[in-house]
């Protein structure tokens, strides 16, 4: 494209230019922080230069064909500071009895948090000073531009070490609350969990908002397992209706290690999660389940890559979407099997239920195989509620609303029932039932 065409393109979309200028202004506030080491400032500057060079995602990017960030870019989000904390902080919004590490408007609240025995909690700054690779370690390479932006602007976060002695029957919850504020804010949290060899843990990562105004969370979560360590990770995205939630979830699984990830999404006007899994050691295993619940004009997008790099590794992927009204969603699932990953066993399935004629679903399961002794399958299906099934339930005495709700429940239960912890499972089911009630009775 020559300079004239570039000028015309820029004139047609001045909001892209204005959005970048606004981010530059916000970046300057964190880049000038006095308490940070110079090496971290250099890292931030390098990452932001990289983000500016790449720019915001464009429609001609294959992974972003069906997701636009135009409304997000047009909104002048301000980077949150500790001055944005409410006068009274309360997490008593539910009855979950789990140890909870609480973030409010992007900022960790140690005095309001409960830390279980057997884990070590450090701020990102402390871990960076100990070893920069603990916080970065090449996560930005080939990733979403928003992961790079998180590196540049990460304004909160924790590094967690979980030892072999940790009693995994007690789940650990990381709760991110966004409260009502007078102007749109953004946060770039980073959560890193390192599992020792033979360690086990149940993790809940939850995002919630009670603001009716727009805000933006751009989160990065990294879970690294040691050899023979096991993690159950439930990620719940239930942001406020006007929020934007962009995320990068990174799993690195060691030999004989296993991660069971479950992604529940019901909130935000715009939601996108780039999930990148690397099976690093022999007999590493990953399970990825997802349940996306969208309505009105919500848009939800999962872009998933599972990289099989060693022999005898297994992966299972099941993502289900339920779309109501004029909502839309995207599923991109990609399994890569390297030449050294013989005996790989990989399966991915995407099933989608449309509750109306105006909902839109884009599904693209992919296999990329460079080994010859593997078992790999993938499939996708999209449809509406069966009229025959509805008729049968009506003939058994159910009213139309109850019959519809029963069928939708049956569709979702395959994901919810696979959550291993009963209290987390019940909590997730209540969230789903609340959403379903709004759809069927609203």
Regions flagged by a language model, labelled:
Residues 2-220, 224-230:
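Short, low-to-moderate order helix/coil transition modules at the start of elongated helical scaffolds
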Residues 37, 45, 50-53, 96, ...:
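Generic hydrophobic-segment detector
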Residues 120, 127-398, 412-442:
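Conserved beta-strand/loop scaffold segments within soluble protein domains that form the structured core
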